[in-house]
C-alpha cells in the first residue's frame, strides 16, 4: 500500500512538473513570437516612412497622431518613432499602432511639451528588451569610448537635435524625474547631482549651459532589483550650424572692416 501511495505521489509530481514546463515553455514561445512581430512592425514603419535622415511626417501622423519625434543612435538598434500619450502608462505596453505588445513604444513623458526647447527636462522612456530592441542599447552610453564618439539624434517635423551625453549611470529607479525647475539654482543643483552620479569621465565636459534643456533617457537595467540606466544629454551645435555662423561672421567682417 505504501509503495502505491509513493508511486502515485511521484506520478503527480512528474505530471505537475511537465504541466509547469509546458506552461512556461508556451509563455517563452509566445514572448518570442511577440518580439518577432514587434521587430517586424518597426522594420516595416522604417521602410515606409524613413529614408536616411528624411522622415515622412505626413505618413507617420496618419499612422498615429501621437508620434512626436524619431530617435536614432548610430551603431545600435535604437531607431524608432517616439510617441507621447495622455499618461506615462499609455504606451508602456502598447505599440505605435495602438495594439498591445509587451515592448510598447519609446515615449516622451506626458508632462513634457512636444516642443523640446520649451522644457527644462525632456524625459524619454523605453523598455530594455532581452532581444536587444527598444532601449536595450542605451547601456552602451555607460562605456567611455562609445559615449565619447556617439550622439543621440532626435528628428522632429521642425528640427533635428544632435545630443551629447554628459552623464550616464545605473541606479535604483527614481520615484520621480523632475520635468520643470522653479529657478536656475534648482536646475544647477540637479545638474550637479547628475554630474556626481556620472560613471563616464570623458563626457562630463558636455554639461548644459544656462537655459539649455536637459534630455533624459531611461530604461530598465539588470544590475540589481528595480535598477534603471539613465543617460542625460544636451544639444550640441551641428557642424552645419557652426559653418553658417562662421559664414555670417566673415560676411560682416568683409562688409564693415574691409
Which residue ranges define each predicted feature?
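N-terminal Lys/Arg-rich, disordered targeting/topogenic segments
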Residues: 1-4
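Intrinsically disordered, low-complexity serine/threonine-rich segments
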Residues: 7, 241-245
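Hydrophobic membrane-insertion alpha-helices, especially the h-region
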Residues: 9-25
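Solvent-exposed, non-transmembrane regions of membrane-associated and secreted proteins
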Residues: 21-238
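Cysteine-centered motifs
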Residues: 239-242, 250
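Targeting/processing segments of secretory and organellar proteins
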Residues: 248-250, 254-255
Amino acid at each position: 500500500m505504501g509503495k502505491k501511495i509513493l508511486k502515485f505521489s511521484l506520478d503527480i509530481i512528474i505530471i505537475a512538473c511537465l504541466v509547469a514546463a509546458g506552461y512556461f515553455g508556451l509563455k517563452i514561445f509566445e514572448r518570442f513570437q511577440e518580439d518577432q512581430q514587434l521587430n517586424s512592425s518597426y522594420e516595416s514603419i522604417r521602410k515606409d516612412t524613413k529614408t536616411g535622415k528624411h522622415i515622412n511626417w505626413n505618413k507617420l501622423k496618419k499612422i498615429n497622431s501621437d508620434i512626436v519625434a524619431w530617435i536614432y543612435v548610430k551603431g545600435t538598434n535604437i531607431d524608432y518613432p517616439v510617441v507621447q500619450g495622455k499618461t506615462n502608462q499609455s504606451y508602456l505596453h502598447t505599440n505605435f499602432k495602438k495594439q498591445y505588445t509587451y515592448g510598447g513604444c519609446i515615449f516622451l513623458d506626458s508632462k513634457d511639451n512636444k516642443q523640446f526647447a520649451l522644457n527644462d527636462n525632456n524625459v524619454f522612456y523605453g523598455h530594455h528588451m532581452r532581444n536587444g530592441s527598444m532601449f536595450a542599447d542605451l547601456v552602451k552610453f555607460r562605456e567611455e569610448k562609445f559615449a565619447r564618439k556617439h550622439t543621440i539624434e532626435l528628428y522632429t517635423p521642425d528640427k533635428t537635435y544632435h545630443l551629447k551625453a554628459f552623464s550616464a549611470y545605473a541606479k535604483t529607479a527614481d520615484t520621480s524625474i523632475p520635468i520643470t525647475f522653479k529657478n536656475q539654482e534648482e536646475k544647477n543643483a540637479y545638474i550637479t547631482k547628475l554630474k556626481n552620479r556620472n560613471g563616464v569621465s570623458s563626457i562630463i565636459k558636455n554639461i548644459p549651459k544656462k537655459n539649455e534643456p536637459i534630455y533624459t533617457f531611461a530604461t530598465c537595467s539588470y544590475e540589481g532589483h528595480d535598477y534603471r540606466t539613465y543617460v542625460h544629454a544636451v544639444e550640441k551645435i551641428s557642424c552645419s550650424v557652426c559653418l553658417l555662423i562662421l559664414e555670417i561672421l566673415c560676411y560682416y567682417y568683409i562688409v564693415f572692416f574691409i
